[in-house]
């Protein structure tokens, strides 16, 4: 059931597609060539991963697989745009992105100023964008959403919001 206006649907789909770029890029690269990912991420002569940690093929492959799992959830959210699925995808993305950002805020010593700014900006966007999109899922149509919650929540009925 679609509960958003066409503008909200478009905004959500664009935002989810942008979010999906990171897990697609990281997930595919780290899964297929873990050593290349470690040595060369994010590309263009930059070496953000190898600058802050030792190589561990198992860990890099696991990170790649986890990013691919996140990509699958985002893809389902993009295709179906079901409120709870979209909210779960966005919250889980932000939950993973926040400690990642916090760690990298404390591990900037081996990076140039430009790389530090680029890295932290990208990581911060991975926290802020899903939270901003999450706000879209509770605005506009929020009355319809509340009504659907009343109808679908266990032990609740539309006539009795407290059950």
Give the role of each language-model region.
Residues 53-78, 95:
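Core segments of alpha-helical transmembrane spans in multipass integral membrane proteins
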Residues 5, 71-91:
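Juxtamembrane helix-break-helix junctions at the cytosolic face
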């Amino acid at each position: 059931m679609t509960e958003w206006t066409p503008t909200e649907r478009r905004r959500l789909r664009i935002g989810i597609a942008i979010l999906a770029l990171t897990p697609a890029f990281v997930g595919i690269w780290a899964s297929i060539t873990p050593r290349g990912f470690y040595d060369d991420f994010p590309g263009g002569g930059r070496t953000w991963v190898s600058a802050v940690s030792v190589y561990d093929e198992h860990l890099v492959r696991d990170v790649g697989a986890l990013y691919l799992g996140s990509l699958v959830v985002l893809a389902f959210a993009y295709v179906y745009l079901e409120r709870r699925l979209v909210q779960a995808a966005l919250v889980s993305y932000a939950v993973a992105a926040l400690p990642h950002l916090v760690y990298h805020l404390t591990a900037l010593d081996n990076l140039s100023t430009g790389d530090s700014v680029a890295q932290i900006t990208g990581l911060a966007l991975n926290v802020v964008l899903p939270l901003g999109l999450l706000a879209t899922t509770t605005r506009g149509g929020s009355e319809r959403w509340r009504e659907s919650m009343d109808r679908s929540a266990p032990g609740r009925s539309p006539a009795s919001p407290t059950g």
